[in-house]
C-alpha cells in the first residue's frame, strides 16, 4: 500500500464533518432568509447582501480547507506534519466555519431589528474578536498536545529498540 505525502493529504468525510456542515448550512440558510426579509421590509440596505455573500463564501472555503488542511492555499500559521495534526486542524476549521456563519447571522438579525444600537460598544466589537481568538488559542493548545503525545510515542518506540 502506497503512502500519501502529507502535502497531498485529503481527509475523508465523517459523520462528524457532515453534522458540522449541516449546522453551518442551516445557519447560513436562516441568515439569508432573515437578510432578504430585512431588505424586503426596507429595514436594511442592499449592501447587506455583499456582507452575507462574503460570509457564505468564507464558510464554504473553511469547510473546503477542513478536508485539505495541509494544502498551501490554506495558509496555516503552524506546520502540519502528521495525519493526527491534520485531523485536529480540520475540526477547528469546521468550528471556525460555524463561527463565521453565526457572525453572518448576527449581521442579518441586526439588519432586521437593529439591536446594535441597543448594545454597548465594548460588547459589539469585543464579542466576535474574543470568540475567534479563543478558538484560535484552543486549536493551538490542542495541536501542541497532539505534538507532545506524538513525541512521547516516538521516544517510547525508540526506547523499545
Residue ranges, per PLM feature:
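N-terminal juxtamembrane cytosolic/stromal segments of multi-pass membrane proteins
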Residues: 1-19, 154-161
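Short membrane-interface loop/juxtamembrane segments of multi-pass integral membrane proteins
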Residues: 6-10, 75-92, 159-160
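Alpha-helical transmembrane segments and their helix-start/interface "positive-inside/aromatic belt" motifs
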Residues: 11-26, 47-49
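Select subsegments of transmembrane alpha-helices in polytopic membrane proteins
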Residues: 18-28, 61-64, 89-101
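Alpha-helical transmembrane segments and their membrane-interface junctions
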Residues: 30-39, 98-119
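Alpha-helical transmembrane segments
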Residues: 44-61, 124-131
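Membrane-water interface of transmembrane alpha-helices
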Residues: 57-77, 136-146
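Alpha-helical transmembrane segments and their immediate juxtamembrane interface regions
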Residues: 120-158
Amino acid at each position: 500500500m502506497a503512502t500519501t505525502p502529507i502535502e497531498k493529504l485529503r481527509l475523508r468525510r465523517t459523520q462528524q464533518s457532515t453534522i458540522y456542515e449541516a449546522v453551518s448550512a442551516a445557519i447560513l440558510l436562516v441568515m439569508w432568509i432573515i437578510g432578504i426579509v430585512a431588505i424586503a421590509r426596507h429595514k436594511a440596505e442592499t449592501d447587506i447582501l455583499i456582507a452575507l455573500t462574503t460570509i457564505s463564501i468564507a464558510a464554504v472555503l473553511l469547510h473546503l480547507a477542513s478536508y485539505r488542511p495541509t494544502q498551501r492555499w490554506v495558509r496555516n500559521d503552524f506546520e502540519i506534519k502528521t495525519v493526527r495534526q491534520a485531523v485536529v486542524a480540520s475540526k477547528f476549521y469546521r468550528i471556525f466555519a460555524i463561527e463565521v456563519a453565526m457572525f453572518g447571522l448576527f449581521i442579518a438579525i441586526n439588519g432586521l431589528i437593529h439591536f446594535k444600537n441597543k448594545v454597548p460598544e465594548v460588547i459589539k466589537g469585543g464579542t466576535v474578536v474574543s470568540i475567534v481568538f479563543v478558538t484560535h488559542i484552543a486549536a493551538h493548545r490542542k495541536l501542541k498536545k497532539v505534538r507532545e503525545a506524538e513525541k512521547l510515542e516516538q521516544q517510547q518506540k525508540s526506547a523499545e529498540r
